[in-house]
């Protein structure tokens, strides 16, 4: 390993000599000596002798390398305690340099499995797992001092059988996972929510149509405005209205092509599909009326970034639709109207904001991949560290 290469990857040392073979050995010594005692701060130090410390370093041109550091042990004449000099890029008690450990962490984070990485680096699988856990824990500790984000998305995702659910807290403004906590009820999340810093600074919280999460937010985030997630509201309307169509015309259960036409937005149909849909609706006028309501309601729910003056007309239209659904003769429409009435304030707020839990759902997909890579590991703390490291 050349002096320039060592200075680029591990600065702070002077090369004494190096031996080039299958294993490249580089003999170095630290440039800076300690100036004071780490225990008492005294400046009267005495050298007690030298010793060699061997650490693994990054490979050079395909050859593994080892750095042999000539270290000194010092004694403080003020307090009488002895200590070893700190080494740049090498933590106490470690047998490898920080650049090498970070390289192993990044390669494992990129998808190289533990067994393959251990074989390539001539390490044990336990060592690779320990290095990865140390770096992820270091990243997770940085979150302890962070305040809650101003725009927060809360949703649940499933885990293994022994621990069925976990709650995800997503920073929608910065598009990253803030934290995850086991459980989804207020009793399970109470201790975690009590430890959060800056809960009073949260301005907006986006959730699905969950009564338990709404009650939880009103208690623990009193200054936050609750916004309904647009995807879940539109899906709720689609499910109930299409259920009416299936009850009116039971043949839709096996005529999936017609059901797909009813499910698709009208402006996304090609001319052939639109002609087929018109012919079907002409034969089924009841389904035609339900389809027209579905189109108008979904178009209203998909409106974004409106000011408060523009929202006034939209509110009148929404209330008219809700009243029409609640007075309908179909039980599914009545259920939908009651749900929209109970969540009308949260639904109206989503017209003012463009952020939604689609960001959180995307991270849930990535978290499923993390669970597959860590298959068999049931420790939630380990899973949380991996999620924060890769999604935070």
Stretches with model-predicted labels:
Residues 54-163, 199-202, 347-348:
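Short, positively charged, Gly/Tyr-enriched micro-motifs
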């Amino acid at each position: 390993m050349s002096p320039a290469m060592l200075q680029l990857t591990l600065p702070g040392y002077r090369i004494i000599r190096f031996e080039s073979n299958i294993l490249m050995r580089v003999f170095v010594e630290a440039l800076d000596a300690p100036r004071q005692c780490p225990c008492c701060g005294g400046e009267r130090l005495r050298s007690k002798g030298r010793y060699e410390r061997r650490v693994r370093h990054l490979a050079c041109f395909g050859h593994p390398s080892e750095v042999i550091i000539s270290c000194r042990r010092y004694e403080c004449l003020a307090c009488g305690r002895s200590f070893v000099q700190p080494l740049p890029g090498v933590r106490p008690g470690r047998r490898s340099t920080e650049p090498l450990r970070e390289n192993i962490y990044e390669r494992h984070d990129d998808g190289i499995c533990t067994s393959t990485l251990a074989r390539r680096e001539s390490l044990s699988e336990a060592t690779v797992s320990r290095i990865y856990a140390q770096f992820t824990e270091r990243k997770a500790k940085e979150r302890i001092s962070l305040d809650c984000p101003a725009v927060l998305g809360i949703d649940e995702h499933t885990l293994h059988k022994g621990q069925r659910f976990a709650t995800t807290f997503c920073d929608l403004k910065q598009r990253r996972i803030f934290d995850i906590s086991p459980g989804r009820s207020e009793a399970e999340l109470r201790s975690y929510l009590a430890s959060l810093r800056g809960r009073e600074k949260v301005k907006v919280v986006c959730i699905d149509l969950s009564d338990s999460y709404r009650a939880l937010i009103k208690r623990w985030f009193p200054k936050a405005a609750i916004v309904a997630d647009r995807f879940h509201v539109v899906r709720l309307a689609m499910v109930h209205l299409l259920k009416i169509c299936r009850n009116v015309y039971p043949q839709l259960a096996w005529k999936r092509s017609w059901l797909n036409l009813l499910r698709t937005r009208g402006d996304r149909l090609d001319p052939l599909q639109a002609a087929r849909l018109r012919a079907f609706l002409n034969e089924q006028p009841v389904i035609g009326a339900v389809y027209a309501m579905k189109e108008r309601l979904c178009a209203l729910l998909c409106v974004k970034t409106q000011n408060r003056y523009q929202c006034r007309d939209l509110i009148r239209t929404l209330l008219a639709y809700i009243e029409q659904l609640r007075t309908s003769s179909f039980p599914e429409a009545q259920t939908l109207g009651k749900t929209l009435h109970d969540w009308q304030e949260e639904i109206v707020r989503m017209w003012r904001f463009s952020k939604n839990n689609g960001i959180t759902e995307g991270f849930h997909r990535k978290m499923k991949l993390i669970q597959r890579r860590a298959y068999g590991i049931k420790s939630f703390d380990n899973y949380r560290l991996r999620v924060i490291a890769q999604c935070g």
